[in-house]
């Protein structure tokens, strides 16, 4: 096998990956609107959701920090809108990215409250609580590091329930603390719940990823337990009423999309019930309900949980809850993508530019792989040197395939040549390439990250297609510089058009990935010349002009 056959193998592997990727794409069918709420779950979160009367909406209050702009409904204390000021909606846009939304076209909310026998969010106890607040807008002031938003509700029996949102400067983790004051003569049985609900089908103005075949990242629910560190749960599975219903001590539930996530992390010593639910009308939910606790008469009970609402910043997420950083969708090659991203981030801490960081990491990766590359070219050179003997053998033995196979193996053994030696290094390179693809698609740090000149977003395609064309040119030079023994006309035609085929494929790929491939090809050209010089000295290569 020679260099040009390697290009053919790369193309076949690449196309196979794209076909598999398209097949794996999480395209959820839009469910028919259901007017009746599903009864396959007994989770308190979904019951609380159903308990909100249409005519009993509370008022909306604004809560702002340097990184979060939340809108909270005093009816139940749900977060109905979340804007992220540090992340523009689009490149060069003044509008912040909106993660949570409540509109006629799309629902995505973070709900929470107190259920159980005596909880105010239990539908059996009437509408969800209408909390009282001191003001309609809360803003984290300059020099202030923490913002508290207390909300109080007193039921007919005189019991007081306080729900306090605690936000910190520069933090996307929101603590939700509950205090229950029992003014009665009997114990109160209380459970906490946290629920994330979202429209299964994205409206056209949000469904930007489906127009680009290269942008395939997971959108759906996920959860973590001590036994299962990270498990995805597809929206279409929830739509089919195949619902989650497990008990866990610790863990979290979440909803994910490219670059951003929301998650509820319960904080208690007991067991939590993790569930999913089809709420009808094309809305899916994932949530938790805690084990009930008793608040004795005259006593105060405290419960709390944490809501993550923001970008998937791995180190910050890992500090909030174990394995929460796994929500970054690096696909099945996460074990390669994660170390690569850590290395890329370390390089960026010195360079300050993600594009130059990609260039440097490309040199590092190709440098580490140089021994494999050298072994690959050496093996191919030896195979080329054996071609005259192999051809003579075929002419001598005619159609006796068994004899040909036996004598070829004997020849390989005598000459100490591994016929698969040219393939193995190639198979090692492909997972690294795919891992880089997943890393660029899943790392929010690279979202809208500029490089230089016309490249203002490394996570988006080149607007002028200059990088893909340059990539095709480098492939063409590699092809022309590589010796070949391919005689089959069809293979020759395929390899002739290979740079064009790859260029077309890469038109829609993120600029960062194309940049990596260009630099990798340039390194290949340099390494190729160094290796060929060494092979010439050993008599394994000749710089005679390639036959056209």
UniProtKB/Swiss-Prot annotation:
Origin superkingdom: Bacteria
Residues spanning the membrane: 6-26, 350-370, 420-440, 458-478, 499-519
Family the UniProt entry places it in: Belongs to the OXA1/ALB3/YidC family. Type 1 subfamily.
Stated name of the protein: Membrane protein insertase YidC
Presence of keyword Hydrolase: no
Biased composition (Low complexity): 30-50
General function of this protein: Required for the insertion and/or proper folding and/or complex formation of integral membrane proteins into the membrane. Involved in integration of membrane proteins that insert both dependently and independently of the Sec translocase complex, as well as at least some lipoproteins. Aids folding of multispanning membrane proteins.
Subcellular location: Cell inner membrane
Residues covered by region (Disordered): 28-55
GO molecular function (one): membrane insertase activity
Quaternary structure and interacting proteins, as annotated: Interacts with the Sec translocase complex via SecD. Specifically interacts with transmembrane segments of nascent integral membrane proteins during membrane integration.
Keyword list, A-Z: Cell inner membrane, Cell membrane, Chaperone, Membrane, Protein transport, Transmembrane, Transmembrane helix, Transport
UniProt cross-references to InterPro entries, sorted A to Z: Membr_insert_YidC, Membr_insert_YidC_N, YidC/ALB3/OXA1/COX18, YidC/Oxa/ALB_C, YidC_ALB_C, YidC_periplasmic_sf
Cellular component GO terms, alphabetical: plasma membrane
Pfam assignment, any one: YidC_periplas
Source organism of this protein record: Escherichia coli (strain UTI89 / UPEC)
Gene Ontology biological process terms, A to Z: protein insertion into membrane; protein transport
Topology relative to the membrane: Multi-pass membrane protein
């Amino acid at each position: 096998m020679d260099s040009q056959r390697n290009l053919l193998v790369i193309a076949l592997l690449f196309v196979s990956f794209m076909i598999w990727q398209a097949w794996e794409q999480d395209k959820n069918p839009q469910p028919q609107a259901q007017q009746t709420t599903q009864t396959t779950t007994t989770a308190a979160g979904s019951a609380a959701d159903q308990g909100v009367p249409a005519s009993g909406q509370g008022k909306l209050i604004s809560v702002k920090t340097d990184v979060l702009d939340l809108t909270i409904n005093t009816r139940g204390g749900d977060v109905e809108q979340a804007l992220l000021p540090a992340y523009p909606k689009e490149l060069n846009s003044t509008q912040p990215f909106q993660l949570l939304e409540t509109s006629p076209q799309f629902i995505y909310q973070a709900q929470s409250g107190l259920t159980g026998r005596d909880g105010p969010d239990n539908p059996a106890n009437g509408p969800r609580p209408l909390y009282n607040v001191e003001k309609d807008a809360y803003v984290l002031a300059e020099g202030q590091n923490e913002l508290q938003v207390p909300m109080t509700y007193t039921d007919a029996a005189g019991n007081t329930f306080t729900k306090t949102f605690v936000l910190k400067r520069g933090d996307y983790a929101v603590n939700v603390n509950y205090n229950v004051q029992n003014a009665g003569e009997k114990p109160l049985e209380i459970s906490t719940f946290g629920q994330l609900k979202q429209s299964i089908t994205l409206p056209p103005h949000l469904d930007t990823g489906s127009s680009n075949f290269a942008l395939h990242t997971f959108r759906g629910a996920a959860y973590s337990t001590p036994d299962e560190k990270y498990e995805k749960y597809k929206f279409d599975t929830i739509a089919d009423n195949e619902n989650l219903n497990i008990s866990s001590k610790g863990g979290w539930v979440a909803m994910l999309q490219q670059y951003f996530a929301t998650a509820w992390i319960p904080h208690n010593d007991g067991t939590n019930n993790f569930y999913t639910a089809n709420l009808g009308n094309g809305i899916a939910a994932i949530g938790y309900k805690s084990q009930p606790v008793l608040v004795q008469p005259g006593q105060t009970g405290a419960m709390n949980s944490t809501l993550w609402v923001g970008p998937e910043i791995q180190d910050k997420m890992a500090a909030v809850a174990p394995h929460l950083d796994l929500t970054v969708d690096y696909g099945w090659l996460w074990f390669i993508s994660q170390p690569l991203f850590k290395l890329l981030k370390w390089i960026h801490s010195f360079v300050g530019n993600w594009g130059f960081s990609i260039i440097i990491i490309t040199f590092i990766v190709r440098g580490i792989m140089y021994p494999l590359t050298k072994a690959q070219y050496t093996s191919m050179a030896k195979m080329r040197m054996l071609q005259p003997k192999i051809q003579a053998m075929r002419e001598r033995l005619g159609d006796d395939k068994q004899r040909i196979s036996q004598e070829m193996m004997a020849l390989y053994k005598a000459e100490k040549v591994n016929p698969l030696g040219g393939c193995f290094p190639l198979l090692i390179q492909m997972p690294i390439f795919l891992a880089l693809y997943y890393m660029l698609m899943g790392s929010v740090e690279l979202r809208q990250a500029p490089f230089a000149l016309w490249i203002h977003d490394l996570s988006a395609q080149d607007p002028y297609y200059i990088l893909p064309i340059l990539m095709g040119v480098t492939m063409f030079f590699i092809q022309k510089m590589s010796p070949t023994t391919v005689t089959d006309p069809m293979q020759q035609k395929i390899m002739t058009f290979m740079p064009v085929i790859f260029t077309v494929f890469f038109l829609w790929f993120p600029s960062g990935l194309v940049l990596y491939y260009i630099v990798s090809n340039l390194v290949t050209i340099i390494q190729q010349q160094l290796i060929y010089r060494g092979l010439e000295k050993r008599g394994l290569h000749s710089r005679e002009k390639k036959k056209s």
